[in-house]
Design a protein with these regions (language model features):
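Nucleotide-sugar donor-binding catalytic core of glycosyltransferases
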Residues: 5-15, 30-37, 41-206
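Short beta-strand/loop segments at the ligand-binding rim of alpha/beta enzyme cores
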Residues: 17-24
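A charged, aromatic-enriched C-terminal amphipathic alpha-helix characteristic of glycosyltransferases
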Residues: 215, 225-246
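C-terminal helix of von Willebrand factor
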Residues: 58-59, 222-228
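PLD-like (HKD) phosphodiesterase/transphosphatidyltransferase domain
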Residues: 1-3
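Short acidic loop-to-helix transition motifs that present clustered carboxylates
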Residues: 29-30, 219
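Active-site donor-binding loop signature of nucleotide-sugar glycosyltransferases
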Residues: 25, 73, 214-216
């Protein structure tokens, strides 16, 4: 039995069985006590899969006693892109879900200087986000996966950051894995402007080739000016995604 596990040591003990192969999604264990609990919790499993290459390499380096393998996160082939795929873009930027604070500040500054910028932003309402365009037009709550993907598909540019970048998340213990949103941006034909710290996971997903990495506002502005006016290279995106479908 295959089982996804979001948080390895916060999950129930029910996955520690000889007939279960668990796959760890968010692996943030670094402390000795956390690691010992992780080993104990899955010591009966014949194989333990680690989605993050960064976390997998870390476990190999400390001689993890479990039988571990790297199984990267992927995206469904129902969204497959080919050389003839076309994208109808409506907005320069669509910001979905939780955002990196630096990229959000950069976009705010950019839109003040370039008042023709079109973008979508979200406001938290309870456990969900409600989305609005730059004029304040209410676009609704994107309550389904397809709503989410359809809105993202209308964006020319995606702003992406790994979870711990710029103190975005403090629970990752320094791990900065690539999240599914990166592949979602690619499969929806978005240019990606990114902030990340290079590690084995960002290398695995080739962020250096598939995104424009920025540090300063000036770099952000230059990237926005360029990418707002360009279509993505669908052939290159299609070739890249063939390595990352489920």
């Amino acid at each position: 039995t295959f089982a996804y596990v979001m948080l390895p040591i916060a999950s129930p003990h029910g996955n520690n069985k000889k007939n279960i192969i668990p796959c760890m999604i968010d692996f943030y264990c670094r402390e000795k006590s956390e690691l010992q609990l992780f080993y104990k919790r899955y010591n009966k499993c014949p194989l333990v899969l680690i989605s993050s290459k960064e976390a997998y390499d870390f476990l190999v380096s400390i001689k993890c006693p479990l039988n571990i393998k790297h199984l990267p996160l992927s995206i469904s082939d129902k969204y497959r892109v080919n050389n003839k795929t076309t994208f109808n873009k409506r907005f320069d930027v669509v910001m979905l879900g939780r955002q990196n604070i630096v990229l959000q500040k950069f976009l705010n500054r950019y839109s003040e200087r370039h008042n023709d910028t079109t973008y979508v932003y979200g406001k938290k309402e309870g456990r969900n986000f409600r989305y609005f365009d730059q004029s304040g037009l209410d676009l609704g709550c994107m309550s389904t996966r397809e709503d989410y993907m359809n809105l993202m598909r209308q964006s020319r540019i995606g702003l992406y950051a790994t979870p711990a970048m710029d103190s975005g998340r403090t629970d990752t213990n320094g791990f900065n894995q690539v999240t599914p949103r990166f592949l979602e941006y690619i499969v929806n034909g978005c240019h990606v402007i990114a902030r990340y710290s290079q590690n084995p996971d960002t290398d695995f997903y080739e962020l250096d080739k598939m995104s424009t990495r920025i540090e300063t506002y000036e770099q952000f502005e230059k990237a926005m000016d360029k990418l707002r006016c360009e279509d993505v290279d669908v052939s290159r995106y299609s070739q890249y995604l063939e390595k990352h479908y489920t």
